[in-house]
From Swiss-Prot:
Gene from which this protein is expressed: MT-ND4
Subunit structure: Core subunit of respiratory chain NADH dehydrogenase (Complex I) which is composed of 45 different subunits.
Cellular compartment(s): Mitochondrion inner membrane
Entry GO terms, CC: mitochondrial inner membrane
Family matches, as InterPro entries: NADH4_N, NADH_Q_OxRdtase_chainM/4, NADH_UbQ_OxRdtase, ND/Mrp_TM
Similarity comment: family membership: Belongs to the complex I subunit 4 family.
PANTHER family: NADH-UBIQUINONE OXIDOREDUCTASE CHAIN 4 (PTHR43507:SF20)
TM spans (from-to): 22-42, 60-80, 92-112, 113-133, 147-167, 193-213, 224-244, 256-276, 284-303, 308-330, 350-370, 393-413, 435-455
EC number: 7.1.1.2
Membrane topology designation: Multi-pass membrane protein
The protein's name: NADH-ubiquinone oxidoreductase chain 4
GO biological processes: electron transport coupled proton transport; mitochondrial electron transport, NADH to ubiquinone; mitochondrial respiratory chain complex I assembly
Amino acid sequence: MLKFIIPTMMLMPLTWLSKNNLIWINSTTHSLLISFTSLLLFNQFNDNSLNYSLTFFSDPLSTPLLILTMWLLPLMLMASQSHLLKESLTRKKLYVTMLIVLQTLLIMMFTATELILFYIMFEATLIPTLIIITRWGNQTERLNAGLYFLFYTLTGSLPLLVALTYLQNTTGSLNFLLLQHWTQPLSPTWSNIFMWLACMMAFLVKMPLYGLHLWLPKAHVEAPIAGSMVLAAVLLKLGGYGMLRITFMLDPLTEFMAYPFLMLSLWGMIMTSSICLRQTDLKSLIAYSSVSHMALVIAAILIQTPWSYMGATALMIAHGLTSSMLFCLANSNYERIHSRIMILARGLQISLPLMATWWLLASLTNLALPPTINLIGELLTVMSIFSWSNPTIFLMGTNIVITALYSLYMLIMTQRGKHTHHINNITPSFTREHALMALHVIPLLLLSLNPKIILGPLY
């Protein structure tokens, strides 16, 4: 794992020592090279003899998320260029450094073997994200958003630390690989029930579960483009990854403890999809759509069948790429029109026809059209939830219809209609932006040719 962690850390001196006109090109090309080397991890055996150490390891569950994290850094750097055009040189370098620090922490988090190291990295990702949101966001409300983000996630994950110390006392170890084989079932005592809640709460806030989701739209809307991308694509997946890792250790409590959370996530899925239909703010709409997609993942993980686990991992990867692409598109609109309100940005298809193609592709992947990887994830999760309980098919069906509705609503509001008079002199789209969109779409389409590499350890 060090062959990814060390080069990523060395991107920091590279950024600070680069010549002024080479900051972007140096950091982007080198991070792209690192992300290409990370693709070697896909060629993996089940026994992990190749990349196992006492501190860092990777298995078929963490590998796809790891590669998604590394793939996203060059894309974030490409997306941020015009956002930072008027900033001073030190601030540009600081911004890039923050992104690199965040990426390093995320790599260490996805590959940690010890639960405490996992927890420390889980918390440490808050700091660079908070700095990115509160320093480079667009409106003044970013301070409020940063506060929400910090306190929701901190208060959610403090009980996890207590639960981990309790686990250490009862089992004598906090190693993932040992605890997976620790077969003693937990008895349903009060202390164990509280431990279950403490373990799950941190990840449910991060996912976010409906009801604990209020920080997400705020943070997304106020963050700069790179902040939104990394928040949607990777930071929400920390919750899913943590749940997938820790549910193995909490058997058989999850079977009866999960019911209220399952109901809440299935209901929240419908609610947040419906909220999307009433949004005027483009970024807010995409943020709420992430909440509804992640609710499906929560439900799938809590059911705990092999199919639902596979569907959850596939859906997490697919959603990471899709929502990141939607935020990039929203940002390219914002840079030209300087407003996130959809009514002010309509009729853009006439001015930017090639961008309209990307908008169409992104909307279709968002509503899980074949042959994208989103379809595979949704099929597996919907089928496993249906076989767990038949009446849920009504909730699922409603959700799929509403998802299609808001995706098409977003497409039609931004691309069709009579364009408003202040859009007459907008700048044409750049090659950089088209490359950015292509680098989001190509993995989505290629993964559908060979989806088994992202279906997790149970495939």
